[in-house]
Amino acid sequence: MIDRLKYSFSGLPPYDASVVDTQAALSRLLDAARLDAVLVTSQDEYVTEYLPRSNNPRYALSGFDGSAGCGIFLSAATAQALGVPPFVLFVDGRYHLQAEQQCDPARVRIEKLGMNVTIWQAMADWLVAHGSRLARVGYDARRISVAQRDRLFERTRAASLDWTSLAEREIDLAIALPGWVVERPIFEVPEAMTGLSVAQNLDALNTRLAAHTGAPDGRTAFFTCASDDLAYLLNSRGYHIPNASSHLGFLFAVGGQVALFLPEGCDRCEVTLESYPALHVIRRDVAALERFLAPFAVEHVCYGFESVNCALVDAVKRVWPQARHADFNPVEAMRAGKTSAVLDRFRDAFARSSAAIAETMRWAKTGEPGVRHTEYDLARAINDAYAARSAVALTFPSIAANGANSAFAHYTAASADVELTEGELVLLDSGAYYEAGFATDCTRVVLRRTHPDTVAQPWQREIYTVALKACIKGLVTRFPSTAKGGDVDALVRQVCRDHGHDFGHGTGHGVGIHVHEGGVRFAPGAQYGLVPNAVISVEPGIYLPGKGGVRIENIVIIRQDDAQPDTVTFENIVTVGYDWDLIDLDLLDDDERAYLRDYERLCVERGTQVTACPLL
């Protein structure tokens, strides 16, 4: 058992799907429903990113357990006619190697996507390309968002597909998916940790809704099933799913009246949210929810089409059939720009995490005389280092990778059979939650060097130094306040390209209550702005399949420059030193050396240096 923190789910029984059996069972459902194909996602009814295997139909039908990726399951007749396996899996560049490793090519065809196409675009294009063999296609209305469905319908219009909504968990039942049940309490975090009361959050929400719709008070309803929306608005936490401090449920707000609906699976959770008396908790009883909502004379319904499932929207339409629906969720923007109280909690959390990571990477580098260490040991070591600093949960399964495994961008196997090998790259990507429930995240790489005569190979020094240069470029550049996330990505990525390398993922993701947060993003073409007081990663990487990979990830606060209000700068809140055995000083310019000298000096002061810096 790797994760032994307070809110881990390590005690749950493992779920190891038999892909042969699940595919046979779903094939029978398709035949009975006269469907040629069905979409299979890795989302739950809350459109959650990280799902446990037991609630992930995509894993059950393919064997692939990465956090992102969807698929199309074909009936036996359709698969035979097309000459392909029954499951077509679509994955982005982070998971090409992992999908190859985990999937049986006789049962799963892997569609490897590049940077310029999304999973949902690729699935739609595949359906159109094979439309002559497809007539009726199903989708799980509880596991697909409104925006995903709308784009899918629009992009496949030319194929004239007959779409069938499956809203009663038909796929889950057919493949005997265990699902997810949690009974953990939903509790408040103090206002001192968030900087805003629940009443202030709801006032801000209603102000933005009124500005968007122009409707009088009480005529606009808002709802969301995004668990970090709930946690933000209600100053609440629950740790209801692995690697997330938030809690499950659907939230409905009309003016000052708020309903927290707990559907099957979380309906037994105790709720102790006492600071907002107008909160109504409704458990499992859909009729009771409809009775609560029906008296409101709602003319507008606002929600994020990207983050609300189709079945929930269909239920809302039954309550307010004449209301106009708007794709508007202001909570994402409200969450992105953090209060000073929240930023203080982030700084504290990253100070603790930085100390844990530096301690663990020193251990990973030098080892212990005469002791064999494995990837599993490394994952355990960072878990225990976090625990020693009062962490309560991991923010994602720690990526502890040795040698060639470090070339898997999201490798999570952490094998007890893979030894940390002398002279190989060792990568650790990890994060933790502390009492306030805000996520941390950081990646560092070291050269395993238990003997003084071990030296880095030229290719190892090259990719490490180039990735470091790219990261520094993102950290120190002053950007105009009008810049977009795509501009930051392009600048960082170009450093790698100038040296003949690139990486198949974005440069940065928002960080908040969840380790991946919307509202800000550094990725090719990203149109999110550089939101002041947002927290976001800067994490270029270089991956050489079969050899090894490097990713250097720091987390920054976007700050408006007081002296130049039209300029933003980045405050790095990670202080974990670098491995100077892997840095080619000849590749560094004077500015990069000066930056690293100051950074390593700070790490020395805080006790978070990993190796001795020759510049000091």
Feature names for model-found ranges:
Residues 1-616:
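Active-site neighborhoods and metal-handling regions in enzymes and metal-associated proteins
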